[in-house]
UniProtKB/Swiss-Prot annotation:
<dbReference type="InterPro" id="IPR016189">
    <property type="entry name" value="Transl_init_fac_IF2/IF5_N"/>
</dbReference>
<comment type="function">
    <text>eIF-2 functions in the early steps of protein synthesis by forming a ternary complex with GTP and initiator tRNA.</text>
</comment>
<keyword id="KW-0396">Initiation factor</keyword>
<dbReference type="GO" id="GO:0003743">
    <property type="term" value="F:translation initiation factor activity"/>
</dbReference>
<protein>
    <recommendedName>
        <fullName>Translation initiation factor 2 subunit beta</fullName>
    </recommendedName>
</protein>
<keyword id="KW-0648">Protein biosynthesis</keyword>
<comment type="similarity">
    <text>Belongs to the eIF-2-beta/eIF-5 family.</text>
</comment>
<dbReference type="InterPro" id="IPR045196">
    <property type="entry name" value="IF2/IF5"/>
</dbReference>
<comment type="subunit">
    <text>Heterotrimer composed of an alpha, a beta and a gamma chain.</text>
</comment>
<dbReference type="InterPro" id="IPR004458">
    <property type="entry name" value="TIF2_bsu_arc"/>
</dbReference>
<dbReference type="InterPro" id="IPR016190">
    <property type="entry name" value="Transl_init_fac_IF2/IF5_Zn-bd"/>
</dbReference>
<dbReference type="Pfam" id="PF01873">
    <property type="entry name" value="eIF-5_eIF-2B"/>
</dbReference>
<dbReference type="InterPro" id="IPR002735">
    <property type="entry name" value="Transl_init_fac_IF2/IF5_dom"/>
</dbReference>
Length: 138
């Protein structure tokens, strides 16, 4: 049986980590560009937000519609919400989405994926390897 000392084991563990985990970068939540057009509220940079968060635009849309209790749809990279909502409220809901469905509850990093296991949604962290269940959006 091969014996390893602590330093050798630590070095082996660091070699197996993906590069993006080793670099220390700060996550900046995207700021929604919100405008009110008549009786609708439009998030103009919705496509960029979904790319930055690495989430399906449909999932983010479901979250906003459920939390705001409204109807809406995605149109050409914009999220159109029926009703007038203050930009601060939209920003707060996006922050809540990020905390619940993007950031790892264990290490706080945004390097996560939403994975469906059977009928349960799991937030899988690619940085620390943690798995945690998240609520299902209907």
């Amino acid at each position: 049986m091969v014996e390893y000392d602590y330093e050798e084991l630590l070095e082996r563990a660091y070699e197996q980590l993906p590069e993006e985990v080793l670099e220390d970068r700060r996550f900046e939540m995207p700021k929604p560009k919100v405008s009110v057009e008549g009786k609708t509220t439009v998030i103009r940079n919705f496509k960029e937000i979904s790319k930055k968060l690495d989430r399906d635009p449909e999932h983010i849309t479901k979250y906003f519609l459920k939390e705001l209790g409204t109807a809406g749809h995605v149109d050409g990279g914009r999220l159109i919400l029926h009703g007038v909502y203050h930009p601060k409220l939209v920003e707060e809901e996006l922050k809540n989405y990020v905390e619940e469905f993007v950031l790892c509850p264990e290490c706080g990093k945004p390097d996560t994926k939403l994975v469906r296991e059977d009928r349960q949604w799991i937030l899988k962290c690619e940085a620390c390897g943690a798995w945690s269940s998240v609520r299902r959006l209907k």
